[in-house]
Amino acid sequence: RDLIHAGGTGGLNWHLHAHQSRQRWQPTVDLLDQFLSQVRPQTEHLLLVGCSAGWMMPPSWLARFERIDAYDIDPLAATLFHWRHGRHLRKLGVQLTAHRQDALATLPDLLQQHPQACVWFDNVLGQHRFRVRDEARVEQELAALQHTLKGRNWGSVHDVYSGPTDGRTLAKDW
């Protein structure tokens, strides 16, 4: 909601950290690019939820769409997403529209407004618990996504270290 914190899931502090960490994150972006290169959505329209500045979004994947509607609550997200990806996408003729909106809260309406679009949740579902702070409600809302998105091409990516863990380590070959 404000420029510094953006509701605890973004803001100026986050974007400065993300910008400074680009090199360190590049192997993850490369793995995501390899995975997404195999994904073949049946549409040219993408609803990108939680886009932030697109720090984790491979440009080659974004370029596969003719239209992208990017949603984020962070007041800096649209400007920084355009800074990172806008020129490249414009050159390719991709129509990019940024929306400052809580897409999770209005997802059924957005799906009706964009009936042919596929949906990608970019580092947003794992943060839902920090915004809502009621674990039972979060679990209920995330479980409802299966019904809400039924019949729709959709996917999600999120880092593992966004919240408390049970202390187990990840398998090295994940």
Identify the residue ranges that each predicted region occupies:
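Class I SAM-dependent methyltransferase Rossmann-like catalytic core
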Residues: 1-43
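Conserved SAM/SAH-binding beta-strand->alpha-helix loop
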Residues: 74
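A short glycine-rich, Lys/Arg-flanked "PGG" loop and its adjoining helix->strand segment in the class I
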Residues: 112-114, 133-154
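A short SAM/SAH-binding and catalytic strip from SAM-dependent methyltransferases
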Residues: 116-135
